[in-house]
């Protein structure tokens, strides 16, 4: 058994064909991530078409997450330039050796600041600032291409939550079955709510909003951001450009804890298997990183460059599934302590999870929106639980959740939906007639939750 942790895989040039995607889905990918920072409508549409063909071939529908560019500063569209260590270079607003595309960048920067280009591959130190022109010394050189990220360590320019490209992306994806929107560089609860408002206005009623924690504001305001979001993503690559690397484990632990105590989904991202961009086997430290992430009870692990541009996208998924499966066996023998809820809905969810585990029985529920399933998943059940859902839209949402297996049965009153879920589980030989099952449904007619423990007789 692979275990309850879900795998998010980024679709890119290396994985954009239906045949590659089908292999990735069959090996355990639960959510396909499309990075809206790259490409455009034509490329995104092609990815979605390939994904639909792959789903049809495998017989499995997955979550679809659009990852927005957010308030990111980038270099211009100039030709690649080689920056040598020791060079004094000019950064200007759409001019100079390093053209920068945001005026706000120059309002933030000061003499002595460290500037990181292209995910930290190139490092500069600022020597002087004059309006929209900055002189900086190259500390670590390299070839700088167009549209690369520009970060000032420890600082974040005051940019709007959504770029013009983000708005175009959301308009395109509005009717494409997107289940999750990843909000990049989330800086506050207000930031998250502004994106949620736009998403709802475009008709994405069920799409969940996940905040990506990528900078100092996200870390310092993690409590309010987690409260405003449906989940958080720990983007370790971008965090590593703002903090010293030895701080990252503590920051990761802090974010996981703040999200867990608010019952939010946690996704860990970046560099899990980065060596596999070039090599077919992971390093020992990468294996340990994935193993420890599962023990830390991350709900999902994200592959980025490994599946988007790497040489071994299928093997990357295979290794992540293999390692997480091994870690799950350890987790099952020593489960983590669960938060003790104070609200009735969460007390009910925890009670159901613990009841099913004490009986070693399957847990089956029917959820019209996926919210009940989210509450169950927040307590990290050690066995797969089955969620009857009314539509493919909700199925894609639930697919992202720890341990959840969605079953599309149609839109019914809750008790009827639960019965339909059982019928489908029986037809697919997932639940057998002699098993004791814990079931739960909401009776709108009587205004009560119904919880049963019974031996099924099909």
UniProtKB/Swiss-Prot annotation:
InterPro entries: Pyr_Knase, Pyrv/PenolPyrv_kinase-like_dom, Pyrv_kinase-like_dom_sf, Pyrv_Knase-like_insert_dom_sf, Pyrv_Knase_brl, Pyrv_Knase_C_sf, Pyrv_Knase_insert_dom_sf. Not activated by classical allosteric effectors. Its cofactor is a divalent metal cation. Keywords: ATP-binding, Glycolysis, Kinase, Magnesium, Metal-binding, Nucleotide-binding, Potassium, Pyruvate, Transferase. Optimum temperature is higher than 95 degrees Celsius. Still active after 120 minutes at 100 degrees Celsius. Pathway: Carbohydrate degradation; glycolysis; pyruvate from D-glyceraldehyde 3-phosphate: step 5/5. Its EC number is 2.7.1.40. It is an enzyme of class 2 (transferase). GO terms for molecular function: ATP binding; kinase activity; magnesium ion binding; potassium ion binding; pyruvate kinase activity. Substrate binds at residues 33, 237-238, 270. Gene3D superfamilies: Phosphoenolpyruvate-binding domains, PK beta-barrel domain-like, Pyruvate kinase, C-terminal domain. ATP binds at residues 35-38, 74, 148. It catalyses: pyruvate + ATP = phosphoenolpyruvate + ADP + H(+). The keyword Magnesium applies. K(+) binds at residues 35, 37, 67. Mg(2+) binds at residues 214, 238. Homotetramer. NCBIfam families: pyruv_kin (TIGR01064). PANTHER family: PYRUVATE KINASE. This is Pyruvate kinase. It comes from Aeropyrum pernix (strain ATCC 700893 / DSM 11879 / JCM 9820 / NBRC 100138 / K1).
């Amino acid at each position: 058994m692979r275990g309850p942790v879900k795998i998010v895989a980024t679709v890119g040039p290396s994985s954009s064909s239906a045949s590659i995607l089908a292999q990735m889905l069959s090996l355990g990918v639960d959510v396909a991530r499309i990075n809206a920072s790259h490409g455009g409508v034509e490329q995104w549409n092609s990815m979605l078409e390939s994904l639909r063909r792959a789903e049809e071939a495998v017989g499995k529908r997955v979550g679809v997450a659009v990852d927005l560019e957010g308030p990111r500063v980038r270099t211009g569209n100039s030709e690649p330039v080689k920056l040598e260590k020791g060079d004094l270079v000019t950064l200007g607003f759409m001019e100079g050796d390093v053209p920068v595309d945001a005026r706000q960048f120059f309002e933030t920067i000061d003499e002595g600041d460290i500037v990181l280009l292209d995910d930290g591959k190139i490092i500069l130190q600022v020597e002087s600032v004059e309006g929209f022109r900055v002189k900086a010394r190259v500390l670590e050189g390299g070839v700088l291409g167009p549209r690369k990220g520009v970060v000032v360590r420890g600082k974040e320019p005051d940019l709007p939550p959504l770029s013009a490209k983000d708005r175009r992306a959301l308009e395109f994806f509005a009717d494409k079955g997107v289940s999750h929107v990843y909000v990049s560089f989330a800086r506050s609860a207000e930031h998250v709510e502004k994106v949620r408002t736009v998403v709802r206005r475009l008709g994405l009623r069920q799409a969940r909003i996940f905040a990506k924690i990528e900078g100092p504001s996200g870390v310092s305001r993690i409590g309010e951001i987690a409260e405003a979001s449906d989940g958080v993503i720990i983007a370790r690559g971008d965090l590593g450009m703002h903090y010293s690397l030895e701080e990252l484990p503590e920051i990761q632990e802090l974010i996981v804890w703040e999200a867990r105590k608010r019952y939010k989904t946690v996704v860990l991202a970046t560099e899990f298997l980065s060596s596999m961009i070039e090599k077919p086997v992971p390093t020992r430290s990468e294996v340990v990183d994935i193993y420890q992430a599962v023990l830390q009870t991350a709900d999902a692990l994200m592959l980025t460059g490994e599946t988007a541009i790497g040489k071994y996208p299928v093997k990357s998924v295979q290794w992540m599934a293999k390692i997480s499966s091994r870690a799950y066996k350890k987790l099952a023998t020593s489960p983590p302590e669960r938060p003790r809820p104070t609200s009735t809905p969460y007390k009910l969810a925890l009670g159901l999870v613990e009841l099913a585990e004490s009986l070693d029985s399957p847990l089956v529920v029917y959820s019209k929106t996926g919210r009940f399933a989210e509450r169950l998943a927040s307590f990290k059940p050690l066995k797969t639980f089955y969620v009857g859902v009314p539509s493919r839209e909700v199925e894609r949402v639930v697919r992202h959740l720890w341990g959840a297996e969605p079953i599309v049965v149609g839109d019914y009153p809750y008790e009827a939906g639960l019965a339909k879920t059982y019928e489908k589980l029986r037809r697919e030989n997932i639940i057998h007639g002699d098993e004791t099952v814990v079931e739960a449904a909401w009776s709108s007619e009587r205004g009560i939750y119904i919880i049963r423990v019974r031996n099924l007789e099909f």
